C-alpha cells in the first residue's frame, strides 16, 4: 500500500470521526494537505432507480402506452407474451419472437424502463369463465394462445355459470385432459420454444428478469400444477394426467437453465424446481391464505435472494385482503396493519420489486407517503457516506480515490454493471475522462439481514463496502475538474443505477468534489446549487445498439 493511499485512508477515518454527530446530514468537501475528504448527505425521499421497486403492467391494446417518463417510481414493466404471437407454427424462427417483442416494447429504452417478460398460453380457462380473445385487438391477452399446429386442451371440467369455479360430472372422475400441456409432443415443443426465447431475450438490454410462466392460467404454474407438492385448486387431491404435468419441472428447469445464461429466471412457487437456482415471483403478497404456500416456502430458500430476484405483486381481489375490504392498492397501503405486513415481508424476503401500482392515485398523500416507504425498502438503495481522493495530481500521475457505500435496501443489484469514476467539465458537467473500476462487483453490495420489526432495522446491519482505486487521466489539459461516480448500464455505457445522495447531477452522476490536474488545489466544494433532485430527473436512458 503506497503512502498516499495510507494518508487518504487515515484522513477519511479522522474526518468521519470528527463528523460523527452529523454523518449523512450535509455535503461537505474539505482540503487536508493534498487530500480532499468528502462527507455526503443521504437523499431521504424515495426515487425511481433501475431494476427495483414498484413494477407496472399495462394491458396491450387496452391501457394506453406511456408517452412520458414514468412517475414517480416506475423502472420496470411486466409484459405477458402470448406464445402464438411469438411462434404460431413450429417452423417459426427466433425472428418472430424478436419482432413481436419490438412491437410490444417499443420506446422503453428512451424512458430507462426495463421489461419482465412472461410467456403464457392461457389467460383464464373456459371452465373458470374465461372469455376468448378480442378479434379487434391483436394483442389482447384474454383467451387461449396455443400455436395453430398444436392440439389445444380438451378437458372434462365444466364451468359453474357466472362463477370462477368448475365441476366434474361423475362419469369424468378419472378422465384426463387431452392435448395442450398433456399432448405427447408438448415437452419437445416447449423446449424448442424456450430456446428461441433465450436467443431473443438473453442478451436483450431491455429485459430485466424473465418469468418462466407458460404453464397454467396467466403462466402462474397452477391449473395444472408443476408438481404434486401442493393440493390442486379445482379438486380435493391430484389426479394423474389432469391436475399436474408429470416431469414438467425437469423439462422446463433444464430448458430455461440452458436458454438463459445471462438473465435471471423467476418461477411462481418456491417449492417447485427444487433442483434449480431460480428467483421467485409470488403474486399474492400479504394474503393470509398464502402464508404457508408462499411466504414460508420462500423463507425456506435461505440465501437464494443473494443471487436471484424475489418479486411478485399485491393482489387485493381475493383472500384476506379482499375480505378486509381492500379494492385497490391504495386501500392496502392506507391500512396500517396491511402496510406493516407488506413492509415486513419485503424486508424478510429481500424483495426486489412488486406489481399492483399501475392504476394507483398518486394524488392521495397518505398513499404516496407509504408507497414511497415501500419503494425505499424494495431492491437496492446505495448510500455513499464518505470519500477521499487526491486533491491535485501532476499531469500523467495517478489520482487515488476511495469511498464507502452501504446498501440500505432489501436486495442486491443482480447484475455486475460497471462502476465508473469520471472527470467532468466544471461548467457543462460533460464527461472528459472516465475509468471503470474493474475490481468492483456491485452485486456484492449486500443489504442487512434478520429484520427486527420493532426496531425497524436489520439485526445484522448492511456492511459498509470500502472501495479504492488509482487512475491516471490521459490527455487532459491542466485545470479543475469535477470527480464523479456512476453505475453504468452496459447498453450504451450510460449512467443508470443511482446513489441515494443529495450531491447529484442531472444525468445520473454523483459528484464528489473538485480535483485539479497540473494545478494547485483550491476549494473542493461543489456549490450545492448545482445539485439536481434525484426524483425529478427524467433524462436517463439506454441504447439498443
Identify the residue ranges that each predicted region occupies:
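Active-site groove signature of glycoside hydrolases
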Residues: 153-186, 193-238
Amino acid at each position: 500500500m503506497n503512502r498516499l493511499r495510507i494518508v487518504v485512508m487515515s484522513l477519511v477515518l479522522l474526518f468521519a470521526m470528527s463528523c460523527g454527530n452529523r454523518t449523512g446530514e450535509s455535503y461537505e468537501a474539505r482540503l487536508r494537505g493534498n487530500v480532499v475528504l468528502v462527507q455526503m448527505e443521504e437523499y431521504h425521499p424515495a426515487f425511481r432507480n433501475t431494476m427495483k421497486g414498484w413494477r407496472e403492467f399495462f394491458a396491450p391494446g387496452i391501457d394506453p402506452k406511456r408517452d412520458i417518463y414514468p412517475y414517480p417510481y416506475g423502472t420496470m414493466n411486466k409484459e405477458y407474451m402470448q406464445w402464438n404471437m411469438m411462434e404460431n407454427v413450429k417452423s417459426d424462427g427466433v425472428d418472430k419472437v424478436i419482432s413481436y417483442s419490438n412491437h410490444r416494447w417499443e420506446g422503453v429504452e428512451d424512458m430507462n424502463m426495463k421489461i419482465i417478460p412472461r410467456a403464457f398460453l392461457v389467460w383464464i380457462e373456459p371452465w373458470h369463465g374465461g372469455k376468448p380473445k378480442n378479434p379487434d385487438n391483436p394483442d389482447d391477452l384474454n383467451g387461449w394462445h396455443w400455436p395453430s399446429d398444436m392440439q389445444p386442451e380438451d378437458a372434462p371440467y365444466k364451468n359453474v355459470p357466472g362463477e370462477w369455479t368448475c365441476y366434474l360430472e361423475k362419469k369424468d372422475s378419472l378422465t384426463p385432459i387431452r392435448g395442450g400441456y398433456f399432448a405427447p409432443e408438448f415437452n419437445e415443443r416447449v423446449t424448442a420454444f424456450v430456446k428461441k426465447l433465450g436467443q431473443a431475450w438473453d442478451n436483450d438490454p431491455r429485459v430485466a428478469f424473465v418469468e418462466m410462466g407458460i404453464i397454467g392460467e396467466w403462466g402462474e404454474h397452477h391449473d395444472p400444477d408443476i408438481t404434486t407438492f401442493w393440493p390442486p385448486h379445482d379438486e380435493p387431491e391430484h389426479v394423474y394426467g389432469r391436475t399436474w404435468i408429470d416431469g414438467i419441472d425437469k423439462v422446463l428447469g433444464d430448458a430455461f437453465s440452458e436458454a438463459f445464461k445471462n438473465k435471471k429466471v423467476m418461477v411462481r412457487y418456491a417449492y417447485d424446481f427444487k433442483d434449480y437456482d431460480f428467483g421467485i415471483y409470488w403474486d399474492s403478497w400479504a394474503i393470509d391464505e398464502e402464508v404457508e404456500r408462499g411466504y414460508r416456502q420462500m423463507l425456506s430458500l435461505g440465501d437464494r435472494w443473494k443471487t436471484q430476484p424475489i418479486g411478485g405483486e399485491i393482489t387485493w381481489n381475493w383472500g384476506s385482503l379482499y375480505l378486509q375490504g381492500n379494492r385497490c392498492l391504495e386501500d392496502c397501503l392506507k391500512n396500517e396493519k396491511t402496510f406493516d405486513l407488506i413492509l415486513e415481508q419485503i424486508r424478510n424476503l429481500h424483495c426486489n420489486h412488486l406489481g399492483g401500482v399501475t392504476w394507483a392515485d398518486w394524488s392521495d398523500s397518505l398513499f404516496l407517503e407509504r408507497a414511497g416507504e415501500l419503494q425505499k425498502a424494495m431492491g437496492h438503495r446505495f448510500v455513499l457516506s464518505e470519500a477521499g481522493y487526491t486533491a491535485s495530481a501532476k499531469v500523467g500521475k495517478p489520482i487515488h480515490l476511495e469511498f464507502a457505500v452501504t446498501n440500505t435496501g432489501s436486495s442486491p443489484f443482480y447484475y455486475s454493471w460497471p462502476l465508473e469514476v469520471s472527470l467532468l467539465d466544471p461548467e457543462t458537467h460533460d464527461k472528459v475522462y472516465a475509468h471503470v473500476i474493474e475490481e468492483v462487483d456491485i452485486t456484492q453490495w449486500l443489504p442487512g439481514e434478520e429484520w427486527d420489526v420493532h426496531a425497524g432495522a436489520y439485526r445484522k446491519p448492511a456492511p459498509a463496502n470500502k472501495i479504492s482505486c488509482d487512475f491516471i487521466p490521459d490527455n487532459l489539459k491542466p485545470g479543475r475538474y469535477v470527480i464523479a461516480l456512476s453505475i453504468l448500464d452496459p447498453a450504451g455505457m450510460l449512467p443508470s443505477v443511482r446513489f441515494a445522495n443529495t450531491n447529484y447531477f442531472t444525468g445520473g452522476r454523483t459528484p464528489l468534489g473538485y480535483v485539479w490536474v497540473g494545478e494547485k488545489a483550491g476549494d473542493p466544494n461543489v456549490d450545492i446549487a448545482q445539485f439536481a433532485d434525484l426524483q425529478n430527473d427524467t433524462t436517463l436512458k439506454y441504447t439498443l445498439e
